[in-house]
């Protein structure tokens, strides 16, 4: 596809992502949707370019007869929830997630708050390039209205995911909202539940989103957790669909260890649907062993929360995630939601009766050794003579491997993982030399 990437349409604002592109994309989306209520919800993060893109989207949608509800800066998962809750035909989020301020993006949701399938995205692209839209007459043009009080609906929804018999009284929590979409909603939720909240990076100016802040730079949160002697710290990214946790010692909790602890928490409460968890191919093998030892099945997907969700639907699961911090509790959210994940993490912490440094350290990770090699071509890996035999050899040694081409560069990415770091290095050297001889 020419426009859509792994998570909507994304690029440099004003260069790739122009108002013309946004307007046409909005019309294409609107004309592909089944029209029921005639309403589409639009939200955004805190980037300056959000104003430009929002107005272009509204222009395109009203031109083809839709009424638009604009709700201002809100997390991506809030758009997913509110689209369904407010009976809209579709939802649009303007955000480039964890990218710098100069990028922006457009994410689409159907009337149930689900991200679009690849087939639906292809349909939108086809409409976009046909460039022949059904513009409405002056009497049929849609209207737009801005609603600023929907934040309350989302707060009530998020708080409903937290156990009613638990409160956060006496707990000190540092929140890093990355100067992004959750800068108002995150501290409100934790304060209402009784926590002593210290918020950092909560003064967006249109340019400072994700800048040395949030889930991409948790080292700043780590310093503040120590400085304020907090029990735990949570870092979100620009659109609050990702979570990074810092324990009371100022240590960043590994993403796979976080997934393991949350799966353990659900399992102990008999809330883990079909006793299974969806993770990606990047998750550490030690997580899989830890879960298997409890009788929990592990299913792996391609990288991307969208693919994790596909596996969750296919296997009828209610929990999954990526080591990068996209965690999906599908009983409460249709997509990764950093705030739902943070509330589940703190509920587990309180009920464990332990310090965060112990509660989230339930197993040791296997060493992972990685390398990239430059390639001059990208033939299918299964067609390279001798590749299957070599990879089988790695597996026979009891080591896991991941060999894949980069989606954006002329590189082959290699990973070997297992109990011994030295053995993993030795096997990686073998793989590196073999693929270099075949592809460089």
From Swiss-Prot:
Reaction catalysed by this enzyme: alpha-D-glucosamine 1-phosphate = D-glucosamine 6-phosphate
Post-translational modification: Activated by phosphorylation.
PROSITE patterns xref list: PGM_PMM (PS00710)
List of residues binding Mg(2+): 97, 237, 239, 241
GO molecular function, one term: phosphomannomutase activity
Modified residues (Phosphoserine): 97
Active site residues per record: 97
CDD domains from the UniProt entry: GlmM
InterPro entries xref list: A-D-PHexomutase_a/b/a-I, A-D-PHexomutase_a/b/a-I/II/III, A-D-PHexomutase_a/b/a-II, A-D-PHexomutase_a/b/a-III, A-D-PHexomutase_C, A-D-PHexomutase_C_sf, A-D-PHexomutase_CS, Alpha-D-phosphohexomutase_SF
Keywords for the protein's UniProt record, in alphabetical order: Isomerase, Magnesium, Metal-binding, Phosphoprotein
GO biological process, one term: UDP-N-acetylglucosamine biosynthetic process
Cofactor(s) required for function per UniProt: Mg(2+)
Cofactor remark: Binds 1 Mg(2+) ion per subunit.
A GO cellular-component term linked to this record: cytosol
Keyword set includes Metal-binding: yes
The keyword Phosphoprotein is assigned to this record: yes
Its EC number(s): 5.4.2.10
Function field: Catalyzes the conversion of glucosamine-6-phosphate to glucosamine-1-phosphate.
Family listed: Belongs to the phosphohexose mutase family.
Protein name as catalogued: Phosphoglucosamine mutase
Protein source organism: Nautilia profundicola (strain ATCC BAA-1463 / DSM 18972 / AmH)
Lineage summary: Bacteria, Pseudomonadati, Campylobacterota, Epsilonproteobacteria, Nautiliales
């Amino acid at each position: 596809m020419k426009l859509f990437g792994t998570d909507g349409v994304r690029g440099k604002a004003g260069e790739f992502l122009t108002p013309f592109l946004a307007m046409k994309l909005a019309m294409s989306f609107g004309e592909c949707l089944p029209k029921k209520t005639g309403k589409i919800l639009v939200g955004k993060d805190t980037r300056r370019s959000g104003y430009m893109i929002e107005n272009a989207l509204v222009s395109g949608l009203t031109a083809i007869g839709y009424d638009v509800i604009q709700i201002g800066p809100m997390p991506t998962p809030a758009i997913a929830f509110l689209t369904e809750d407010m009976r809209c035909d579709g939802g649009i989020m303007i955000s480039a997630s964890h990218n710098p301020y100069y990028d922006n993006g457009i994410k689409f949701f159907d009337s149930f708050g689900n991200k679009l399938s690849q087939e639906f995205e292809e349909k939108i692209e086809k409409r976009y390039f046909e460039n022949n839209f059904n513009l409405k007459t002056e009497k049929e043009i849609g209207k737009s209205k801005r609603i600023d009080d929907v934040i309350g609906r989302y707060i009530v929804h998020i708080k409903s995911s937290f156990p009613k018999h638990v409160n956060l009284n006496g707990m000190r929590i540092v929140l890093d909202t990355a100067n992004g979409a959750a800068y108002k909603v995150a501290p409100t939720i934790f304060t209402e539940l009784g926590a002593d909240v210290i918020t950092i990076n909560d003064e967006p100016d249109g340019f400072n989103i994700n800048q040395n802040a949030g889930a991409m730079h948790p080292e700043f949160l780590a310093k503040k957790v120590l400085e304020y002697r907090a029990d735990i710290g949570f870092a979100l990214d620009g659109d609050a669909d990702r979570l990074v946790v810092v324990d009371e010692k100022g240590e960043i909790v590994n993403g796979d260890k976080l997934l393991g602890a949350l799966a353990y928490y659900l399992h102990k409460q008999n809330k883990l649907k079909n006793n299974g968890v969806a993770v990606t191919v990047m998750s550490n093998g030690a997580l899989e062993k830890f879960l298997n030892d409890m009788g929990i099945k592990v299913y792996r997907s391609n990288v991307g929360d969208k693919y994790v969700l596909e596996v969750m639907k296919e296997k009828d699961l209610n929990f999954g995630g990526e080591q990068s911090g996209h965690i999906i509790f599908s009983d409460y959210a249709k997509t990764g939601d950093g705030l739902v994940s943070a509330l589940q993490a703190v509920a587990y912490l309180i009920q464990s009766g332990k310090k965060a440094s112990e509660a989230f350290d339930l197993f040791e990770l296997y060493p992972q050794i990685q390398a990239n090699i430059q390639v001059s071509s990208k033939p299918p890996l299964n067609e390279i003579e001798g590749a299957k035999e070599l990879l089988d050899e790695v597996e026979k040694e009891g080591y896991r491997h991941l060999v894949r081409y980069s989606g954006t560069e002329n590189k082959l990415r290699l990973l070997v993982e297992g109990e011994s770091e030295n053995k993993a290095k030795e096997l990686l050297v073998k793989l590196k030399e073999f693929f270099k001889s075949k592809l460089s």
